[in-house]
Regions:
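Carbohydrate-active catalytic/glycan-binding domains of CAZyme proteins
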Residues: 1-294
């Protein structure tokens, strides 16, 4: 592949997200420099094999659209109705709260331009890490985090979107708090902040619905997993054991023509984050690590 010179260890991003299309892997993420604050947008890296990557190409310039006030976080690119939609978190100029915006492009390489009418998370909430979910009836939803910075015990929520993904069209539903899972650290301090990060939805080969998300367990960043017991987004779910509990998280899963992968960033130390790729297996009623890493 022309101009392929980077290995994963050379790529310093948080919150990796991969879109696989036509034999190529498109990698997006938060520019880790300054923890993604005022970094001016997002890049895309391209690979044929998950090992050798192109130099980054800017795919969204947040300065151009006056969206570089602070946070430029967690870009995800979803193909929907023939176009490419980027869900990403920015700090708003108006109220200085973070929220998820939707951007649009005709190509996975960008350039992306603003698409949504504003945030597609609640206006007065501080939110991050919105992801797109399409239910069995083809209706779009956003799944996102209500931040611990505003409510102490962070939550994961969802809400319906308009068919064109330009606005939120219903009241949010809270799924759970960071302190809810059976394995969560049970603090003696009620005002201790608890983090929720990075939801991502996946439907298995047997039509089971899962959600990846991240938090901290015993002080280390962790990749967690929820199973929706009736196969649809709602309040009937089970917290499964964490997939990774040793300083790695904000992951997502993707398939190529042969294999199934989890990507996440690790370590969680600013300046040292890199995308990692682990082969996983869809066994229908669960997602399991195969313990091999690209």
């Amino acid at each position: 592949m022309r101009n392929t010179i980077l290995k994963c260890k050379d790529i310093n991003i948080r919150d990796p997200f991969v879109l696989y299309e036509d034999g190529k892997y498109y990698l997006y993420g938060t520019r880790a420099r300054f923890f993604g604050m005022k970094v001016g947008g997002f890049d895309v890296y391209v690979s044929d094999d998950l090992e050798n990557w192109s130099r980054p190409t800017e795919c969204f310039n947040s300065r151009k659209y006056k969206m570089n006030k602070a946070s430029n976080w967690a870009p995800e690119v979803h193909k929907y109705n023939g176009a490419y939609y980027m869900f990403a978190t920015f700090t708003r100029q108006s109220n200085r709260l973070r929220g998820t915006f939707v951007l649009k492009s005709d190509s996975p390489l960008g350039p992306f331009v603003p698409h949504s009418k504003g945030v597609v998370t609640p206006e007065e909430w501080e939110c991050l890490d919105g992801t797109l979910y399409i239910n069995r009836d083809g209706k779009p939803y956003i799944v996102f985090c209500h931040e611990h910075t505003q409510i102490i015990d962070g939550t994961i929520c969802y809400a319906p979107l308009s068919d064109d993904l330009s606005e939120i069209i219903g009241e949010p539903v809270t799924l759970f708090k960071a302190s809810s899972p059976y394995w969560a650290d049970k603090s003696k301090y009620p005002k201790e902040h608890r983090i929720t990060d990075g939801p991502f939805m996946y439907r298995s080969k047997t039509d089971e619905l899962f959600m990846l998300w991240s938090t901290f367990i015993k002080g280390k960043y962790a990749q967690c997993l929820v199973k929706f017991n009736d196969g649809e987004l709602g309040m009937n779910f089970t917290h499964l054991p964490p997939m990774i509990d040793n300083d790695g998280g904000h992951g997502m899963v993707f398939k190529d023509n042969k294999n199934f992968y989890l990507t996440f960033h690790s370590p969680n130390t600013n300046g040292f984050e890199h995308p990692r790729f682990i082969e996983i297996e869809d066994i229908g009623n669960n997602i399991v690590l195969k313990k091999t890493e690209v």
